[in-house]
Amino acid sequence: MAIQKAKFSIGDFVKHKHFEFRGVIYDVDFEFNNSEEWYQSIPKNVRPRKDQPFYHLLAENDEITYEAYVSEQNLLMDDSDEPIKHPLIEEIFSGKKGSSYFKPSN
């Protein structure tokens, strides 16, 4: 299998193409790396391909914050510059610039 190149980077603000939520990327899997049970729980008509990057997000919608695992094909860049209001942001990132967060330099 060819190595996949990720379209998005850690710290980028993204939004889902089909569902009303947005988030910040905190990790990337260059191909699907979750359980088969999780994958099969996605309705077949919207189930993404496994051979693409999948992103771990600190996500939010109008009601709650949560963590999400989303395929690249279902994400768009979110250039709103509005901060993500997730309680784990400060544990992972050290600052914000435009529509992305950055990690502390060690």
Where are the model-predicted features located?
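Mixed-charge, Lys/Arg-rich low-complexity intrinsically disordered regions
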Residues: 1-13, 18-22, 29-32, 103-106
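Residue-level signal for short segments within beta-strands and strand-turn junctions
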Residues: 27-29, 59
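Short, solvent-exposed secondary-structure boundary/capping segments
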Residues: 32-41
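Intrinsically disordered, low-complexity boundary segments flanking structured domains
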Residues: 12, 41-46
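Short amphipathic alpha-helical leader/targeting segments
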Residues: 25-26, 37
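Intrinsically disordered, low-complexity, charged/polar segments
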Residues: 47-106
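Charge-rich, low-complexity amphipathic helices
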Residues: 1, 36, 45-47, 79
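Generic detector of isolated residues embedded in canonical secondary-structure elements
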Residues: 22-24, 56
